[in-house]
A protein has these predicted regions:
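Conserved donor-binding/catalytic loop of nucleotide-activated donor transferases
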Residues: 64-67, 88-97, 113, 119
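A conserved mid-protein helix/loop that constitutes part of the nucleotide-sugar donor-binding site
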Residues: 2-16
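Nucleotide-sugar-dependent
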Residues: 5, 55-62, 69-89, 99-108
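Nucleotide-activated donor-binding/catalytic signature segment of Leloir-type glycosyltransferases, i.e.
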Residues: 27, 35-68
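A short, well-ordered alpha-helix in the C-terminal region of glycosyltransferases
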Residues: 140-153, 164
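C-terminal alpha-helical cap of glycosyltransferases
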Residues: 133-136, 155-173
Length: 173
């Protein structure tokens, strides 16, 4: 868990959600002090749990038991503004509905496949309002959208593109 990713914003989202929602955070304690800060921020809210990490091989199958993958990454720098993080694709491969802020690259995929919701801004309360408006049918539809996206965004489908890019770059040297 890196402080620059502002995971506390996801805890703030929970503070605006109704009782249907729970948040399980699976964090590697890279910065133990930060993890303790997050636990303190979650307070006594029983809907927020810190669960032990699983291996990379287990991550997608484990995550499939959930309904929604939440990822709110404020655009504090160019890389975060244009991010397509592994976590986002893990959610899609797990066939989850995705709930994000308006990060342009993630939002493009979410809208293209109708695999989640995109908040109007990066305020936790805005994403909470969007999540509270969802019905079970909405979530099921979005999970079906992730199923479609998961078949497009695979290593196998993108391997040839990566080879072409690497070959092109190497030719320049």
């Amino acid at each position: 868990a890196m402080p620059t990713r502002q995971i506390e914003k996801m805890i703030e989202v929970m503070q605006g959600l109704d009782d249907r929602f729970e948040l399980d955070l699976m964090l590697v304690p890279t910065f133990p002090g930060y993890l303790e800060k997050l636990k303190a921020k979650s307070g006594t809210d029983r809907r927020i749990r810190f669960i032990p990490p699983v291996s990379m091989e287990e991550l997608v199958p484990f995550s499939n038991a959930y309904d929604i993958g939440l990822y709110l990454l404020p655009p504090t720098n160019f890389n975060y503004a244009m991010a397509l993080p592994n976590k986002f694709f893990e959610f899609i491969q797990a066939r989850l509905a995705v709930a994000i802020g308006p990060s342009p690259e993630m939002a493009r995929i979410v809208r293209q496949f109708d695999c989640g919701i995109v908040a109007d801004d990066f305020a936790p309360a805005t994403l909470a309002r969007a999540l509270n408006s969802l019905t079970a049918a909405d979530v099921d539809r979005m999970k079906a959208g992730s199923e479609k996206a998961a078949h497009v965004y695979t290593a196998e489908n993108n391997a040839e593109k990566v080879r072409e890019i690497v070959t092109s770059v190497l030719k320049e040297f």
